[in-house]
């Protein structure tokens, strides 16, 4: 009877455990610019987002052709860290590559 308790009216009431809610997921979006090389974008996708060379190439082409591309979808804290990592890597390499978060 660990999951039950008696109410004030003497009836046995079952404890209702709150349902665990999945965390909100955020897209990490890479934004195209005229200076960051395709090779560097592929490197970022492979190292920061653990994409295979083929996946990284496809994602890089999406960024190149459409002006933006989804690098991955993560919970807030992970997505925020990945955006900071991309920005830091790009600045250290001398590129203006930007990453953004979108709910979704």
PLM features: residue spans?
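Terminal domain-initiation and capping elements
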Residues: 1-104
């Amino acid at each position: 009877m660990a999951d039950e308790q008696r109410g004030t009216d003497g009836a046995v009431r079952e404890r209702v455990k709150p349902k665990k809610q999945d965390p909100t997921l955020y897209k990490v979006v890479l934004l195209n610019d005229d200076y960051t090389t395709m090779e560097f974008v592929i490197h970022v996708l492979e190292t920061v987002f653990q994409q295979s060379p083929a996946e990284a190439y496809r994602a890089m082409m999406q960024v190149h052709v459409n002006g933006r591309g989804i690098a991955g979808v993560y919970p807030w804290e992970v997505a925020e860290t990945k955006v900071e990592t991309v920005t830091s890597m790009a600045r250290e390499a001398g590129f203006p590559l930007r990453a953004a978060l979108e709910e979704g």
